[in-house]
Amino acid sequence: MTARRLINIVPNTSKLDPLKEEDSTHLKQNQPKKFSTKELMLSEYTERKSCSLPLSKSRSGSSASSSTTGSNGKNIGTRRPSSNLDFNFASQDVVKNVLGNNNPHVPTAKCIRPISDDSIGTSSTEIFSSSHSNTTSDSLCTSDISSEEGEIANSKMEDNCFFKSMREADHRSNITPLKKSRPGSILQKTRTASSADKTICSMSTITTCIPSRQNSVSTPKLSRTVGLPGSSNTTNSIAASQTSFISENDSPLKHHCMSTATIQEPKLMPITKTPYVHSNSTSVILPYKTTQLTPSQRYRLRKEQNDQSLRKAIKMKEKFYEDQDVNLELQEGDVDGSLIWNIPMASLSTSSFLTLSKFNRKEMSLDSARGDEEILIQENNCEGKQHSSSALCVDKTFHQVHSTRKHTSNSSNTLKESCLDYKELPPTCIPGISPVSDSQYIQDTMKNLSQIYLHSSEKISKSILSGRSRSVQSLPLEFKEASSQGMEDLMLVSEDKLKAVSHFRPSWLPPKDFKERKLQDKQIYKNIDLASMEELQKNKERDEKAKKNEQNKVKFQHLLDRGITRNSSLSELKKIIWETPLISKVRLQIYSQLLQSDNCLITKCFIESFEEVMQLLNKMDFPKDKEFEIRQLIEHDVQEKVFYKNGTDKQVVSDLMLLLQLKSISQQGLVTGDEMLFYHFLTDQSFGTLKETWEMVNLIQMTCFSEICKEKYDSRILNPRGIVAHLLRKDEFKNEFNGGCLNSNTWWNILQRMDHKLFMWVMDVIIVHNGQNFANYPVKMEIFKDKVWEYYRSKKVIVNYKILVSLTVNVLLNYHFGYDNLKHLSDLDDKHFCIPLYTEDSIEEENLNNIFTKWWLHYYRKLR
């Protein structure tokens, strides 16, 4: 039975001696009740006052009209909490008038403002009310006096006897811990047995409200008061609930309880549902999740929940801490056990054949499964014969039924899941039934189990070896090569070893760590993917480039037919020449029309004819020293350079010798670059005869590399305020930014290190950007027929030195490696030194040439 707390409340009109009160308590339990005249008058006054209180009140504005007025003339229902003090004074005056002024035990009321439950109440404390809104107002209106006395007494309590068990209440029926209280009220806490005549009013309330919150009330964590754990708040709520219960039930029983319990007997206050009453403990609000919480309560609730979750997480980490660091015990010094590589590796050891995770039947082939089943059947027959003597003690019918059921239900599962052949285990004798001793029973069982273990281990070893022998042919090539060299036994190669050995490392070397191997393989595969993507992109660009070249070749012929010297044709030609070089069929014709128009004025008027110079050479005896110089020039500037092919026809060398001799005896004489121009034009299919080569080389030297162009090149490239000085404003070019390294002669050193295709492409670009619009500004033979070359050059020759300067800047910024400066570039002994790079692959060579021309175009646009 749940312990009930009986609180005796002595009226504040009397002051009892503690000893006398104990005696009176014992007498009241055994004697009938007697009332004096003063006591009857006080009970009648109390009854009228309680009857005048309203049954229920709402917190709305209409509560003022429905409230009644007590005998003292004050409105109790609508008064403020601070008015309780005046109400107490009025009550004391009435009591003094009834009992008389001679009573020395009448206490003096202390002016303490009562504590209102409205400021901290979080849920209803009323039991029988129909609406929730009336709960707080009713309990406040009817329990002002009792709540004042309860709050004052709560501050003076020392011991809370309510939470003691019923067993102590039986042995100690009357325990009244007293303490001097403040003047105004005395609170006595007494434990008594249940009396029907004393608690007829309050027992029903207690039995109604105790079962709902029995566990929470019995827990001392529900309220905390300094020095009084869980006592004051419970007493206050009990007083408020019982007063509310009495005021709401207007019956004779109520009047009887009011008259008897108010004056003579202590009030029994019910235990009500008080989730949070004057307590700051977080544990109080945790069980009441349906209660509307204040912000501070929600904060403490979240804080408590976070602390609990953190404790659980720490507890789980501490629980599994040892399992996470098991591998640390395997380390010896600085060497991890996983890096021990010189021990033969096998998938299953002799002690691990019982584990099911490492042995997977599904990886075995159908033939091996059938072979294992045949071996299993044969050995089962042998084992059955050997253990026939021990099986006689068991019922044959049970053995047949059990073995058949076991074989039919577990045969497939045993082969797939278990490494042990449990059906090979013979039925053992039953101790106590079969005539077999305990020692014999244990020996037979151990013998049978040992045979099963040995047989299972042998069978697994045979199956693994047979599987390895069949998978020898499917091993990687690295293992086969190692086996042929005597470094590997293919029968010892297991799946674990296949996983440990990397394909990028020989099998006889120590295996890499798993994480390292995984990381390196990932990086290798990533680089391979990038390389493959780059190669695919290059192939795509190469295909697009081939299509573009075919289109440009068609455009060349179309522009030539339309008129290459037109302004529109010339502008379009200057665009596509950076993408595709001129083809051999149209190169000679385009060169001639762009530099001297269709009438070939320069060739006819200002260049010596090939026949005249040839006749002059045949008539004269060419000087030997001059011939020696020409041979040295061919060997140094042609045969030792990258563009010279070892399989070059000797006729080309002899023709080059002849053309250089002719040039040396002509009016212009030998100039820088003649040997390279003659050699490349002789080896190219664009120029068929020596005459065409002679005329074209002289035409290019007189127009594109004239004296005026060379002078501008030498002066502008060294201009400290020019774009070249801005681009070359680096410490690396400090020693070569001078006239000795940067001039028109060293410019030809760049062309010495280019192959034939790039050299011809460079000539195409230079000639196209030196072309003139002869369609709009034609050249008339009559005007310049009798004029000197200098006059014609000043009128009709374009000096485009920027195309030469941009080529120099491109080489210095992007291809300046392997040499100190352009002057020393011609003295390099490496024949394979090439600009941009040396390669024998024609596809790669074309790609490099495209990149070179793109950079050249970039710097040319900056200089324009």
Swiss-Prot record:
Keyword Transport: yes
Record's compositionally biased regions (Basic and acidic residues): 17-26
Location in the cell: Golgi apparatus
InterPro entries: Sbe2/Sbe22_C (IPR031403), SBE2/SBE22_M (IPR053949), SBE2/SBE22_N (IPR053948)
Annotated region described as Disordered, given as residue ranges: 16-84, 123-142, 213-235
Domain of life: Eukaryota
Compositionally biased residues, Low complexity: 51-71, 123-139
Swiss-Prot/TrEMBL keywords: Cell wall biogenesis/degradation, Golgi apparatus, Phosphoprotein, Protein transport, Transport
Keyword hit for DNA-binding: no
Gene Ontology BP annotations: fungal-type cell wall organization; protein transport
Modified residues (Phosphoserine): S82, S83, S450, S532
Biased composition (Polar residues): 72-84, 213-222
GO cellular component, one term: Golgi apparatus
The protein's role, per its UniProt record: With SBE22, is involved in cell wall integrity and polarity processes like bud growth, through the transport of CHS3 and UTR2 to sites of growth.
Entry similarity comment: Belongs to the SBE2 family.
Name of the protein in its database record: Protein SBE2
Top-level taxonomy: Eukaryota, Fungi, Dikarya, Ascomycota, Saccharomycotina
Gene encoding the protein: SBE2
